[in-house]
Structures are given as structure tokens and as C-alpha cells.
């Protein structure tokens, strides 16, 4: 198996057929809904909150609300349905999460999307949760993860998952590979390719995205949607503390398995960093879309499908050629 990561790959351009990149369509379909771009902010507490979720839903972007304020999920689903926006929440696999599914079913609330969100998604506990959701809320689109092997993808799909989330510890604030010796950190793009070849349903690439060009690379190697953490951290709208150092503003960004999220130093596989303030989330989304439109134009097409067909080269660690962004 070829092993490589985002910084090792460059996509090879095809003849451009559009007059302007603005003609290129970045729309993606996931389940019953179309979204403006194949990107989704990570379902982490310092990345997504209710106001951001509402902004994304209102403006045609996909989102997944995090699961760390458990009691707010049913009111959140109600609110989003009242506003006729998509409802998309996360669950774990503990007993209280089964009670949540039962309560949603009892109240006749069917979220459009539920993401089963645990670090090691290739497990009996995730399979059982998939089956419970599909039994009690059969119309809900279920995303399950996280996984890093074709066997895991097939098993979760066979259990009823509508999409799988691929990535074990490649994120900027994840230290799974250091703490455990396991993961897809350092070869996330190759793992995505490996898993996508086995998949019959959509794959969400999760982790390791450091530049906007990495979104196009994820699409090329089989992702339908790309989950992004660090590039969405540090915005005006982001949750988390702000600090000022030498006149420069920074915002905190921590992993879901960090002691800052857990509230205790137990089974820690995440850390906290400070991200320089980036301004408005809206501006970042516009720039991402423009860059992805450029990617489509370089691929020689008019929509995302063109990116899936381009050739590529593997040139280890040479993408920046000594430059920094």
C-alpha cells in the first residue's frame, strides 16, 4: 500500500474549460440535502456552537453540533425544525445516549443527521448504537466514526450507517498516535484512499487538513465531505477563551479527548493550543469556496466530480518548497 499524507501529494492540472472560477459549482449532496460546499466544521466545543450552527444551516452549509451539552440537544433539534433548517447532532454510546434516542422518538423528533462520535468507532458499542438509531429513527441519516480501516467502514455500513467518518488522531490537537501508538496521523490521506475504495456509502474525511488545498485532495481520494478543525478555530464567532499577548489576540482550541474537555486528566488523547485570531468565520468560508472553485478549474471541470478524476504525484514533504503560508 502506498503511504502518503496531504503534504506529500500534488494534483496534476487538466485543461481549463471555464472562463472564470466563479462558474465552478462546489455543491455536494449528503443524504437528502444539498450543501454549498463539501466541508463541515469539526463537532468540537471550541469549533461549533449553537449560533454558528444556526448561521451555517441558514446559509446552506453542513454542520454537526457537538455532544458536550447533552441536555440541550432536544431543544436544539426542536428549534432547528421550527426554523425549517436541517437538524444535525452528535451522540456517544453511553446509556444516557440511548435514553436520548428514545426521547427523540417518543416526541416524534427525527433529526436529519445524527453522528455517532467516539474516538475508536470500529466497536460493538457503535454498531449497537447504529442499530438502535435505525430502529427508532429510521429516517435519520446516521454518520458513524471514527475509523481508519476498510474493514471498519464495511462493518459500520453493514450495520446501517449511512456514512462513515475516517481519521484516527490526525488532527492538530489530537495526540492519540503519541499516547497509544495507533492512528492515521502522518498517513491520513492514504488511509482515506484505502477506506474509500472499500466504501459503498459516503466517506467523511476527518482530520489532518492544514490548507484549503487539502480539501481538494480529500475529494480526489474519495471523500464526500471534509471535516475541519484547526482552520475553523480562532474566529470571532468561535467558543473558547480569548487572550492578548503583545497586542495580538489568540483563541483557545482544544481536542475533544483533552483534559480541558473532559474536566479531568484521565485517558487524555488531546491537547490545547492557542490560535491567532482570524476574524470573521464568514470571510473564511468565502475564501474556502473560492479556493475550491479554483481547484475545480485546475481539474478541468465545472463541479467537484472533476477533482475525483485528476492524476497526482507523490513528492515527499515538498509541497511548500521552503515557503510558509
Curated annotation (Swiss-Prot):
GO terms for molecular function: GMP reductase activity. The keyword Lipid biosynthesis does not apply. GO terms for biological process: purine nucleotide metabolic process. Pfam families: IMPDH. The active site is at residue 174. GO terms for cellular component: cytosol; GMP reductase complex. The keyword rRNA-binding does not apply. InterPro entries: Aldolase_TIM, GMP_reductase, GuaC_type_2, IMP_DH/GMP_Rdtase_CS, IMP_DH_GMPRt. Keywords: NADP, Oxidoreductase. It comes from the Bacteria. It catalyses: IMP + NH4(+) + NADP(+) = GMP + NADPH + 2 H(+). Its EC number is 1.7.1.7. It is an enzyme of class 1 (oxidoreductase). PANTHER family: GMP REDUCTASE. Catalyzes the irreversible NADPH-dependent deamination of GMP to IMP. It functions in the conversion of nucleobase, nucleoside and nucleotide derivatives of G to A nucleotides, and in maintaining the intracellular balance of A and G nucleotides. Belongs to the IMPDH/GMPR family. GuaC type 2 subfamily. NCBIfam families: GMP_reduct_2 (TIGR01306), PRK05458.1 (NF003966). This is GMP reductase. It comes from Helicobacter pylori (strain HPAG1).
Amino acid at each position: 500500500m502506498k503511504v502518503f499524507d496531504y503534504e506529500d501529494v500534488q494534483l496534476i492540472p487538466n485543461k481549463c474549460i471555464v472562463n472564470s472560477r466563479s462558474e465552478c459549482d462546489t455543491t455536494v449532496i449528503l443524504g437528502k440535502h444539498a450543501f454549498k460546499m463539501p466541508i463541515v466544521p469539526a463537532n468540537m466545543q471550541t469549533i461549533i456552537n449553537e449560533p454558528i450552527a444556526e448561521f451555517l444551516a441558514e446559509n446552506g452549509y453542513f454542520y454537526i453540533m457537538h455532544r458536550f451539552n447533552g441536555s440541550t440537544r432536544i431543544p436544539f433539534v426542536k428549534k432547528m425544525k421550527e426554523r425549517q433548517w436541517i437538524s444535525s447532532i452528535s451522540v456517544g454510546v453511553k446509556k444516557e445516549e440511548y435514553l436520548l434516542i428514545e426521547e427523540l422518538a417518543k416526541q416524534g423528533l427525527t433529526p436529519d443527521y445524527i453522528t455517532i462520535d467516539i474516538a475508536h468507532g470500529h466497536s460493538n458499542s457503535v454498531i449497537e448504537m447504529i442499530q438502535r438509531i435505525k430502529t427508532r429513527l429510521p429516517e435519520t441519516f446516521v454518520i458513524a466514526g471514527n475509523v481508519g480501516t476498510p474493514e471498519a467502514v464495511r462493518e459500520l455500513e453493514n450495520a446501517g450507517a449511512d456514512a462513515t467518518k475516517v481519521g484516527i488522531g490526525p488532527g492538530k490537537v489530537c495526540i492519540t498516535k503519541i499516547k497509544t501508538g495507533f492512528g492515521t496521523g502522518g498517513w491520513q490521506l492514504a488511509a482515506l484512499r484505502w477506506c474509500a475504495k472499500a466504501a459503498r456509502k459516503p466517506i467523511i474525511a476527518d482530520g489532518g487538513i492544514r490548507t484549503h488545498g487539502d480539501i481538494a485532495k480529500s475529494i480526489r481520494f474519495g471523500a464526500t465531505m471534509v471535516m475541519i478543525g484547526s482552520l475553523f478555530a480562532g474566529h470571532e464567532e468561535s467558543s473558547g477563551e480569548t487572550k492578548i499577548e503583545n497586542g495580538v489576540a489568540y483563541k483557545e482550541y482544544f481536542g475533544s479527548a483533552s483534559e480541558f474537555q473532559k474536566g479531568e486528566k484521565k485517558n487524555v488523547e488531546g491537547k490545547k493550543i492557542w490560535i491567532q485570531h482570524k476574524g470573521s468565520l464568514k470571510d473564511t468560508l468565502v475564501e474556502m469556496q473560492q479556493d475550491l472553485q479554483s481547484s475545480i478549474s485546475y481539474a478541468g471541470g465545472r463541479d467537484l466530480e472533476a477533482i475525483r478524476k485528476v492524476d497526482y504525484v507523490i513528492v515527499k514533504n515538498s509541497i511548500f518548497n521552503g515557503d510558509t503560508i
